[in-house]
């Protein structure tokens, strides 16, 4: 073994297997790009993003950890969200929940 060497298993790795997902259509109504990270509570994203926030409550982007999705001004796109796991307690972000979901 070489320090830092990666030895991935054969086949494909399915992210968030068996977790609840929803799709939402999101429009950036602002005049600047907005980037949302993989573990940000989507319900609490920038107010310039127009979408059904109640559907997104308790969900985050269904993308690989450490990555993000960028919404350009005027852009509309559909994204898949995955349910937050664990204790489902949310603190921080934009302070809209600050407790159990």
From Swiss-Prot:
Q: Provide the reaction this enzyme catalyses.
A: urea + 2 H2O + H(+) = hydrogencarbonate + 2 NH4(+)
The enzyme's E.C. designation: 3.5.1.5
Naturally occurring in which organism (per UniProt): Cupriavidus necator (strain ATCC 17699 / DSM 428 / KCTC 22496 / NCIMB 10442 / H16 / Stanier 337) (Ralstonia eutropha)
Which Gene3D superfamilies does this UniProt record tie to the protein? Urease, beta subunit
Protein known as: Urease subunit beta
The gene coding this protein: ureB
Q: What class of enzyme is it?
A: hydrolase
Instruction: Read off the Pfam families from this record.
Output: Urease_beta
Gene Ontology cellular-component annotations: urease complex
Which pathway does it take part in?
Answer: Nitrogen metabolism; urea degradation; CO(2) and NH(3) from urea (urease route): step 1/1
Recorded hits in InterPro entries, A to Z, give:
Urease_beta-like (IPR002019), Urease_betasu_sf (IPR036461), Urease_subunit (IPR050069)
Sorted keywords for this record are:
Cytoplasm, Hydrolase
Per UniProt, subunit arrangement is:
Heterotrimer of UreA (gamma), UreB (beta) and UreC (alpha) subunits. Three heterotrimers associate to form the active enzyme.
Query: Which NCBIfam families would you find in this protein's record?
Result: PRK13203.1 (NF009682), urease_beta (TIGR00192)
State the family it belongs to. Belongs to the urease beta subunit family.
Q: Please state where this protein is localized.
A: Cytoplasm
Q: Name one GO molecular function term.
A: urease activity
């Amino acid at each position: 073994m070489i320090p830092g060497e990666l030895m991935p298993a054969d086949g494909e790795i399915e992210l968030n297997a068996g977790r609840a997902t929803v799709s939402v259509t999101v429009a950036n109504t602002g005049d600047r790009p907005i980037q949302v990270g993989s573990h940000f509570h989507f319900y609490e994203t920038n107010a310039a993003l127009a979408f059904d926030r109640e559907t997104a409550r308790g969900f985050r982007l269904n993308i690989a950890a450490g990555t993000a999705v960028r919404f350009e001004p005027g852009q509309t796109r559909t994204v898949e969200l995955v349910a937050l796991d664990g204790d489902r307690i949310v603190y921080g972000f934009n302070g809209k929940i600050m407790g159990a979901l």
